[in-house]
C-alpha cells in the first residue's frame, strides 16, 4: 500500500463520553466513504462483541481505513482509530491517541461536556493532537448548540467558531467532518528512512491465527517477509501476514511510516504483545522503544468461585482463554472455607470486573459467586517490611503491623449546580477531602475531591447518579497511598469466620458496617433446625451480633394430656439433638448474602 504518499494520510480518533454517539458517527463515516456498503451495514459496526452492542459501550479498540476523495480531487487515506470512552480503559485510550495526529471531539448538543470527555481531551492535548470539535445530535429537540459551544470554550479552551454541527443518526454534517479531517489534521511525519518502530495500540486473540496485533508504523516500514522483535517482552517472531483494516482485514505486502495495519505472527497470548509495546525489526532494530509503555495494573480485586465445585477446572480454562485476549486481567487460585476452590482476580475497575464476569457466564456457561470487591492495601509491618494485601482475609494481625495505607484517588465530578450540596454530602460520607470547586458555566460545577479508592469501588457511582437524577458524571485517577486508621472486620456465622465477607473498614465506620452486615445476613440466610449466631468482630472483640432462631418441630403434638414427665423427656431429647446438630451442622450461605455486602451503603 505504499503508493499513497505520506502527505495524503490522516490518522484520527474520536473522543466522546459514553452515549454521545461515537460509534454511530463512526458508522456514518464508514458509509459516507463507501468503506462499508449499505447492505453490510449494521448498527455500531466497529463494536463486534455482543456485549459491547448490548451495553452500548466500546470495550476493545477498533480501527478502520477509509479512502476519501477530497474537494481538491485528490484521494486521501483516512485511518479511524475507535477508542473506548470508559474511565476503566483510559490506558488503552492514551495508547490509541499516541497513534493519531488528530481527534474529533464529539459532544452531545443536548448534554454538553462530560467528565470522561474532558479526561480524554487532556490526554489528547498532552499528545499534541489537533482537535476538531463536533456537536452531535443537533436534530434533537433539546439541542442547544450555542450554549454547548460556549461550554467547550470555557472548559477546554478550544476555539469553537469552526465547530461542526452534525447528526450521526440522520447523516447531517458528515461530509463536512470528512473534509475538515483532511484540511485540519496534519499528515504523519515522513520518517521512512529511520529504523522501524511501530506502536501496538490493540491486540486480540483469534483461535485460528493466534494474536492479531493492530499497530501504527511510526518510523521506517514493515514488510511481510520481515522478522519482528517486540521490545518490552524481547520476543521475536516470523510474520505470517500483514494487512490493513477496511474494516475487514485485507492482506498487503508492506506498510510504511504513518500507516495503520494489523499483523499476525503466531503469537500465543495477548500478554506477549502488550498494548503500548514497540515493534521493531530483528535485523535493523531501533535503539530505544517508543515512550509511554506501562503495564496495566489492576486496581480492584474480588474472588470468583463456581457455585458447583465440579466447574472449577472449567473456570480455570475460561480465565486462561479470557486472559489471552485481555492482558489487564490478573488471577491466582484461592481457597475459602465457606466457598471451596476459586480464583482471586484483579481488574482495572468496576466496569471491567462486571464485563469479565458477564463474559465468563455468557461465553463459557459458568455459574459464579463473586465476593465483594476490594483494593490493594499497603501494610507496614513492625519488622520494617511492607506487604501488599489485595484480599482482606489475609490482613496480618494488629500486633504484627505498624500501620495500613490505602490508595486514594482524585475524583472530579461534573454536575448541574443544584446538586452541589447533595454531592458534597456524598463525598464527605465517603471520607473525601475537599480540594476545589469550580463553576464552569453559570449552571454547571466541577467538584474535586480526594477519596479512598475503597469508597469509590463499591457503589459510589450508583449513588452519585441517583442523587443527581443521572446528570452528574465523574472521572478519577490514582494519586498514591495514605495512612489511615483501618481495621479488619470479620463476620462469624455459627462461630466460623466467613472469609468472603471479611472487609477492611475505617475504625469510625466499623460499628455501623458490622451492625448493617449482621442485620442483612439475618434476613438473607434461611433458618436451620438450630439457632445460628451471627457476629461481626474486630480481632477478638465482638462489635455486633444477631441470631437466626431455629425452626422448631412440635414434638409434643402427639401427646394429648398425660403426664408432664413424658413431655419433658421429649423436649429434652429434642434439645439434645439440636445441640448435636449445632456442633456438627454447616450453614449454607446464599449468593445474595455476599452481594449484600456490596449493597451496604458504606
From Swiss-Prot:
Entry's family note: Belongs to the TRAFAC class translation factor GTPase superfamily. Classic translation factor GTPase family. LepA subfamily.
Gene Ontology CC terms: plasma membrane
PANTHER family (alphabetical): TRANSLATION FACTOR GUF1 HOMOLOG, CHLOROPLASTIC, TRANSLATION FACTOR GUF1-RELATED
Protein name: Elongation factor 4
GO molecular function annotations of the record: GTP binding; GTPase activity; ribosome binding
Function: Required for accurate and efficient protein synthesis under certain stress conditions. May act as a fidelity factor of the translation reaction, by catalyzing a one-codon backward translocation of tRNAs on improperly translocated ribosomes. Back-translocation proceeds from a post-translocation (POST) complex to a pre-translocation (PRE) complex, thus giving elongation factor G a second chance to translocate the tRNAs correctly. Binds to ribosomes in a GTP-dependent manner.
CDD domains, per database record: EF4_II, EF4_III, LepA, lepA_C
Taxonomic lineage of the native organism: Bacteria, Bacillati, Cyanobacteriota, Cyanophyceae, Synechococcales
Gene3D superfamilies: 3.30.70.240, Elongation factor 4, C-terminal domain, Elongation Factor G (Translational Gtpase), domain 3, P-loop containing nucleotide triphosphate hydrolases, Translation factors
Predominant place of localization: membrane
Keyword entries, A-Z: Cell inner membrane, Cell membrane, GTP-binding, Hydrolase, Membrane, Nucleotide-binding, Protein biosynthesis
Occurrences of domain tr-type G (ranges): 7-189
Membrane topology: Peripheral membrane protein
Pfam hit, one: GTP_EFTU
Gene Ontology process terms (BP): positive regulation of translation; translation
SMART domains from the UniProt entry: EFG_C
Annotated EC: 3.6.5.n1
Locations listed in the record: Cell inner membrane
Residues binding GTP, per UniProt: 19-24, 136-139
Gene: lepA
Reactions the enzyme catalyzes: GTP + H2O = GDP + phosphate + H(+)
Amino acid at each position: 500500500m505504499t503508493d499513497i504518499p505520506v502527505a495524503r494520510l490522516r490518522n484520527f480518533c474520536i473522543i466522546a463520553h459514553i452515549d454521545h454517539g461515537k460509534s454511530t458517527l463512526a458508522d456514518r463515516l464508514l458509509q459516507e466513504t463507501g468503506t462499508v456498503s449499505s447492505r453490510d451495514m449494521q448498527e455500531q459496526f466497529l463494536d463486534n462483541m455482543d456485549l459491547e452492542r448490548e451495553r452500548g459501550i466500546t470495550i476493545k479498540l477498533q480501527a478502520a481505513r477509509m479512502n476519501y476523495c477530497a474537494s481538491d480531487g485528490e484521494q486521501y487515506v483516512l485511518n479511524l482509530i475507535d477508542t473506548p470512552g470508559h474511565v476503566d480503559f483510559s490506558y488503552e485510550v492514551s495508547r490509541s491517541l499516541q497513534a493519531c495526529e488528530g481527534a474529533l471531539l464529539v459532544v452531545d448538543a443536548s448534554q454538553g461536556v462530560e467528565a470522561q470527555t474532558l479526561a480524554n481531551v487532556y490526554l489528547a492535548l498532552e499528545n499534541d493532537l489537533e482537535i476538531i470539535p463536533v456537536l452531535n445530535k443537533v436534530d434533537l429537540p433539546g439541542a442547544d448548540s450555542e450554549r454547548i459551544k460556549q461550554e467547550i470554550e470555557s472548559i477546554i479552551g478550544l476555539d469553537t467558531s469552526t465547530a461542526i454541527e452534525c447528526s450521526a443518526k440522520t447523516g447531517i454534517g458528515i461530509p463536512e467532518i470528512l473534509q475538515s479531517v483532511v484540511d485540519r489534521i496534519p499528515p504523519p511525519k515522513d520518517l521512512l528512512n529511520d529504523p522501524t518502530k511501530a506502536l501496538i495500540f490493540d491486540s486480540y486473540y483469534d483461535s485460528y491465527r493466534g494474536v492479531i496485533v493492530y499497530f501504527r508504523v511510526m518510523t521506517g516500514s514493515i514488510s511481510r517477509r520481515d522478522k519482528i522483535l517486540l521490545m518490552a517482552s524481547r520476543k521475536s517472531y516470523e510474520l505470517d501476514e500483514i494487512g490493513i483494516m477496511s474494516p475487514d482485514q485485507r492482506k498487503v505486502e508492506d506498510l510504511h511510516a504513518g500507516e495503520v495495519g494489523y499483523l499476525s505472527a503466531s503469537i500465543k497470548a495477548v500478554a506477549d504483545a502488550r498494548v503500548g509495546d514497540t515493534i521493531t525489526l530483528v535485523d535493523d532494530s531501533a535503539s530505544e522503544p517508543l515512550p509511554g509503555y506501562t503495564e496495566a495494573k489492576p486496581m480492584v480485586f474480588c474472588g470468583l468461585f463456581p457455585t458447583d465445585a465440579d466447574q472449577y477446572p472449567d473456570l480455570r480454562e475460561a480465565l486462561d482463554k479470557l486472559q489471552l485476549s485481555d492482558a489487564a486481567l490478573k488471577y491466582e487460585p484461592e481457597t475459602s472455607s465457606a466457598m471451596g476452590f476459586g480464583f482471586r482476580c484483579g481488574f482495572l475497575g468496576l466496569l471491567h470486573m462486571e464485563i469479565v464476569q458477564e463474559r465468563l457466564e455468557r461465553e463459557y456457561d459458568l455459574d459464579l459467586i463473586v465476593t465483594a470487591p476490594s483494593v490493594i492495601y499497603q501494610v507496614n509491618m513492625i519488622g520494617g517490611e511492607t506487604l501488599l494485601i489485595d484480599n482482606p482475609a489475609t490482613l496480618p494481625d494488629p500486633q504484627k503491623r505498624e500501620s495500613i495505607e490505602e490508595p486514594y484517588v482524585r475524583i472530579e465530578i461534573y454536575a448541574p449546580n443544584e446538586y452541589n450540596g447533595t454531592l458534597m454530602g456524598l463525598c464527605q460520607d465517603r471520607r473525601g477531602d475537599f480540594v476545589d470547586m469550580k463553576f464552569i458555566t453559570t449552571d454547571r460545577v466541577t467538584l474535586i475531591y480526594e477519596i479512598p479508592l475503597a469508597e469509590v469501588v463499591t457503589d459510589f457511582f450508583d449513588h452519585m447518579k441517583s442523587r443527581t437524577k443521572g446528570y452528574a458524571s465523574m472521572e478519577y485517577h490514582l494519586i498514591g497511598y495514605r495512612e489511615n486508621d483501618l481495621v479488619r472486620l470479620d463476620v462469624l456465622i455459627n462461630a466460623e469466620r466467613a472469609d468472603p465477607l471479611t472487609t477492611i473498614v475505617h475504625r469510625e465506620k466499623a460499628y455501623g458496617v458490622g451492625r448493617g452486615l449482621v442485620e442483612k445476613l439475618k434476613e438473607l440466610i434461611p433458618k436451620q433446625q438450630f439457632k445460628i449466631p451471627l457476629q461481626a468482630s474486630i480481632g477478638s472483640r465482638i462489635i455486633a451480633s444477631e441470631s437466626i432462631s431455629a425452626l422448631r418441630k412440635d414434638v409434643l403434638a402427639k401427646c394429648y394430656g398425660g403426664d408432664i414427665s413424658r413431655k419433658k423427656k421429649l423436649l429434652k431429647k429434642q434439645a439434645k439433638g439440636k445441640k448435636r446438630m449445632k456442633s456438627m451442622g454447616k450453614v449454607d450461605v446464599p449468593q445474595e448474602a455476599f452481594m449484600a455486602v456490596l449493597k451496604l451503603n458504606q
